[in-house]
A protein has these predicted regions:
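Non-catalytic interaction/Regulatory regions outside core domains
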Residues: 1-145
Length: 145
């Protein structure tokens, strides 16, 4: 069941976004929620840790808390890559739980270089991980913020 609570955030306050941004963020989040097994999705600024928009989630999945926590996961991985002198970029990070997949997809398309990521939570019993990764890549390619 999709929670229709769609929120946009800027710093700690909810904001009204320009029409073009709103349509693109809203469309991307709604498309992500059509992925089989989707429980919740956020578009997150990993510089600040704040979510720009959430869809889904619920009582047991606070997407704002998850956004901040997953920002730390990304920062830790980037520090590790720097320590190892890896000249590469993170495409996505998968966290596998007993009942869920948590997929963190850093946005890399040329129109979107603001340090954003999509965070998607999937029910393991209903999700096809390979297909979900493919669909999230497609959503990323079309997203303009």
């Amino acid at each position: 069941m999709i929670n229709a609570d769609l929120r946009y955030r800027d710093d700690a306050k909810t904001r009204t976004v320009g029409r073009a941004d709103s349509v693109n963020i809203e469309t991307a989040l709604k498309e992500a929620m059509t992925i089989d097994g989707a429980v919740g999705v956020s578009l997150v600024d990993w510089d600040s840790g704040m979510s720009l928009g959430n869809l889904g989630g619920g009582k047991y999945l606070d997407l704002d808390v998850a956004a901040a926590g997953n920002t730390e996961v990304i920062r830790a991985k980037m520090r590790t890559m720097e320590s190892l002198r890896l000249d590469d970029n993170i495409e996505d990070i998968l966290i596998t739980l007993n009942k869920q997949y948590h997929l963190i997809r850093l946005l890399k398309n040329s129109r979107n270089e603001q340090g954003l990521f999509l965070y998607l939570v999937l029910d393991r019993q209903k999700a096809n991980l390979a297909l979900a990764r493919h669909q999230l890549r497609s959503i990323e390619a079309e997203l303009v913020v």
